[in-house]
Amino acid sequence: MDRAALDAAYNNGAAVRNSAEIVTDWQARSRALRTRAGASLDLRYGPAERDRIDLFETGKRAPLLAFIHGGYWQMREKETFSFIASGPLEHGINVALIGYTLAPQARLDAIVAEVRGALDYLSERYSEIVVSGWSAGGHLTAMSLSHPAASAGLAISGLYDLEPMRLCYVNDKLRLDEAEQKRNSPIFLPAVKKPLVVAYGKSELPELQRQSEEFARKVNAKALGLEGHDHFTILEELASPRGTLTRALLGLTGR
């Protein structure tokens, strides 16, 4: 594909006409959830300004879902995604939302290191951590699964071969070179022998579906294609206590 074709193949916002309205709804629901009892906001895990965690606890000794937000490593923030905690919390699973420095202020190597630093911090409080994330957060999930504190992973609508990212509009801010792309592409790295679910929407862009299916095959993970969901609506299946992704999470925690 040439640059124009690649740009279109990975432009999730343009592919979903009401994506802006969906994100606005996420933000409203997240604001409401952040007022709940048991919320500890902006816990600092590292030296950078965005090295902060929002923690939603059930008050019980239970597994933790550590969720990494998306935005092609260069936009969005953890606060927008608090709404996804609703489903796990209903089942007694604690939830952490991880923030990190965005490109171009940070290179991808540094972003990966920050997220692993967040897991260092969380491992002091939790013995069972399922790492999860959406879009760029799905990529960071795969890159973090090797962390000793991670017991399992739930990667949602992620990117696992970053060569297309290097060649399309995403790289205008991400600034990947070929070497950095290769060492941060999970599909080219040794498989981590831990339980992993690779989820994607069957109404997503074909390239996103391809990346998920090929990565799941490569690492012998469970591929979970969700009918009727695009790149944005798929997160409703984690926000809902009865959602498919919530059920997948329960399976990863043995519940």
Spans of model-derived segments:
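N-terminal cap/lid segment of alpha/beta-hydrolase-fold proteins
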Residues: 9-60
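Short beta-strand element of the alpha/beta-hydrolase
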Residues: 62-71
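Short beta-to-alpha linker loops that shape the active-site pocket of alpha/beta-hydrolase fold enzymes
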Residues: 71, 94, 99-103, 159, ...
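Catalytic nucleophile-loop/oxyanion-hole region of alpha/beta-hydrolase
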Residues: 76-85, 96-128
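Primarily recognizes the serine-hydrolase "nucleophile elbow" in alpha/beta-hydrolase
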Residues: 117-173, 181
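The feature captures the conserved acid-bearing segment of alpha/beta-hydrolase catalytic domains
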Residues: 152-161, 165-170, 176-217
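C-terminal catalytic histidine-bearing segment of alpha/beta-hydrolase fold enzymes
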Residues: 209, 213-216, 220-255
